[in-house]
């Protein structure tokens, strides 16, 4: 497959604006606020996937090596209650982060106040302080996600330089990205730079044939990106839960499968206009309930029963999709082919991952569940790029501006 060379320099992201990177700053003896993305999946107080932590290390180590005093900000999950605060305490990442950096990372359990300010003032060159989950500020008043001006200004007051390396939140205007960047000399980190270069390259000049794989649940969530990509892609292969809305729009029986009823008319119009581009499953795996104990069977789309739920694409659909993928030179994939978290319903996703890992093609995995599946199934190093941002990558490919980047462009 194609391997992209990433050159870390001032980055032209496809327009006249030039973004400064961390390498454009003198970091020695400076307090460097780095917005990272440590929004990792957690179960039973254990980190299930540390990919986002691992991807942040290059930027953090660079700041350490250049003599910076590093202050890390990140969110973890959503915080709408005191119980959410307990569940999403960011201190859980400290042991793994310390291990990866080879130093003892300090942690402040507060997002503001004298304790935080004192810990910042006591930092020595080359030391790292991780601040508590920025979304603690979302309860009860959504100050973080609402980009509260005072909060952004306060966090900015803690540092000398701001580096945004959290691509996964770049499509959001939050106090911890836009708010800080509006008040401080700012640039981007190595991860953000790589994400922008790779995804803008695909958006602006994809190698042809260009195939998009879309899965996941609701069509409505991806209408914008579908409208953008259907104009430039050669084929769009649709699997996962969203495929059943398209099949319903073609008057197919979908049993009790997931249906985005509000999007049926949209799907009808899209199929009518782009029938040769939109490729849908021809068979599926079905069951009566989604659980580890559920019995399942494979059947054609026409043979699904009223009480059955589609949970994966079938073997014939995999072979159909392979025909379009085999000649592709660019593949962008967002959304798994089925309920991949259950072993019996993961074969469609696994089979497509395996096939893509062995063809001569530029392959981009766009964040979220697809990235987690690729990593968990052992394909972490098999693709050109696995993005750390689901929504951010889709909005960039759609042609939208990313507020977290735009705030730095406009400095």
Regions found by a protein language model. Give the residues of each.
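Active-site loop-to-helix "anion-binding N-cap" substructures in soluble metabolic enzymes
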Residues: 4-411
């Amino acid at each position: 497959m194609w391997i992209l060379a990433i050159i870390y320099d001032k980055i032209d992201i496809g327009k006249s604006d030039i973004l400064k990177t961390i390498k454009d700053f003198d970091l020695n003896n400076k307090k460097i606020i780095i917005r990272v993305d440590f929004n990792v999946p957690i179960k039973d107080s254990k980190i299930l996937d540390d990919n986002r932590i691992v991807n942040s290390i290059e930027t953090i180590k660079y700041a350490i090596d250049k003599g910076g005093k590093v202050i890390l900000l990140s969110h973890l999950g959503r915080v709408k209650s005191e119980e959410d605060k307990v569940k999403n305490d960011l201190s859980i990442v400290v042991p793994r982060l310390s291990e990866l950096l080879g130093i003892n990372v300090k942690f402040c359990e507060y997002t503001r106040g004298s304790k935080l300010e004192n810990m910042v003032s006591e930092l020595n060159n080359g030391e790292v302080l991780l601040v508590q989950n920025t979304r603690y500020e979302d309860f009860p008043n959504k100050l973080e996600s609402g980009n509260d001006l005072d909060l952004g200004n306060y966090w900015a007051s803690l540092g000398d330089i701001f580096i945004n390396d959290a691509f996964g939140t770049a499509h959001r205007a939050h106090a911890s990205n836009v708010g800080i960047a509006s008040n401080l000399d700012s640039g981007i980190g190595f991860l953000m730079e790589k994400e922008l270069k790779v995804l803008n390259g695909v958006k602006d000049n994809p190698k042809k044939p260009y195939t998009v794989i879309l899965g996941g649940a609701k069509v409505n969530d991806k209408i914008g990106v579908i409208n953008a990509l259907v104009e430039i892609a050669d084929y769009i292969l649709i699997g996962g839960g969203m495929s059943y809305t398209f099949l319903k729009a073609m008057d197919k029986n979908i049993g009790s499968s997931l249906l985005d009823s509000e999007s049926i008319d949209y799907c009808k119009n899209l199929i009518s206009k782009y029938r040769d581009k939109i490729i849908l499953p021809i068979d599926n795996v079905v069951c009566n309930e989604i659980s580890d104990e559920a019995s399942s069977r494979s059947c054609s789309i026409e043979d699904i029963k009223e009480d059955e739920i589609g949970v994966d694409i079938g073997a014939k659909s995999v072979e159909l999709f392979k025909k379009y993928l085999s000649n592709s030179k660019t593949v962008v994939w967002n959304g798994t082919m089925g309920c991949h978290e259950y072993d019996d319903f993961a074969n469609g996703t696994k089979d497509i991952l395996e096939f893509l890992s062995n063809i001569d093609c530029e392959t981009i995995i766009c964040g979220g569940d697809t990235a987690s599946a690729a990593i968990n199934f052992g394909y972490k190093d098999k693709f050109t790029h696995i993005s750390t941002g689901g929504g951010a990558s889709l909005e960039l490919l759609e042609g939208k501006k990313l507020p977290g980047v735009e705030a730095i462009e406009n400095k």
